[in-house]
Amino acid sequence: MTQNHDPYSDAKELAGLTLGKATDYQAEYDASLLQGVPRSLNRNAINLTAESLPFHGADIWTAYELSWLNAKGKPMVAIADIQLSHASQNLIESKSFKLYLNSFNQTKFDNLDAVQKTLVKDLSECAQGDVTVKIIEPKSFGIQRVVELPGTCIDDLDIEVSDYDFNPEYLENSTDEKQIVAETLNSNLLKSNCLITSQPDWGSVMIRYQGPKIDREKLLRYLISFRQHNEFHEQCVERIFVDLKHYCHCAKLTVYARYTRRGGLDINPYRSDFEHPGESHRLARQ
């Protein structure tokens, strides 16, 4: 059994986070509420450097509780689709993101464009990387789609499970080198825990790959082994990507997870070495 070394226990970068602490909610705009976490914390642990990442992609956020005041003081509401580049120096800590968005609630903005530009500026500065923001107004709420992840779901495999500790070695000897395939698989059984609070994070994951055929039972056991694992969403997806590359020798690979929302936000990390994210559509559990 592989021991799960904790690279975060002494990380000074996590000590000042508001996550897991009692917090006062501010209703007037304050960009300083945003807090970033260096991506290097996790990437160092899985032997990745910013100069030689094996993937591209984005952290795709949906903010369902965006509200502000217009120039006349009338409340406005919207949904925001936000994409944060995988290459940014920091990921954005989700509780701080929620507190930051709440600070818009009693703040006047001249128009929608001012809200969008403020979000891009503040999030880019916190993440130290590229951010795009699309604001969806109420008149477009009715055309928002609920979809299923593409591919074949592996959750109905009749396996017996007794070990819930993270173990990438479930992927060892999991491929048939004589069968080279291109397929898309998915699972709704992904669960990990918040790195700071240990609250459960519920997700669905899509794995699209080309290469030796992966044993689906072993893949499902591997995904289930995240059940007691403490890491942020983005870190889990990058870990899955690296493990699949290492153990399964995928020639091409995409890992895309969509997590259920918390505090009005959902986080949907996307990592690939051959394709790019399309439109963001929520799943039924989101």
From Swiss-Prot:
Its EC number is 1.7.1.13. GO terms for molecular function: preQ1 synthase activity. It is found in: Cytoplasm. It comes from the Bacteria. NADPH binds at residues 94-95, 262-263. It is an enzyme of class 1 (oxidoreductase). Catalyzes the NADPH-dependent reduction of 7-cyano-7-deazaguanine (preQ0) to 7-aminomethyl-7-deazaguanine (preQ1). This is NADPH-dependent 7-cyano-7-deazaguanine reductase. It comes from Shewanella oneidensis (strain ATCC 700550 / JCM 31522 / CIP 106686 / LMG 19005 / NCIMB 14063 / MR-1).
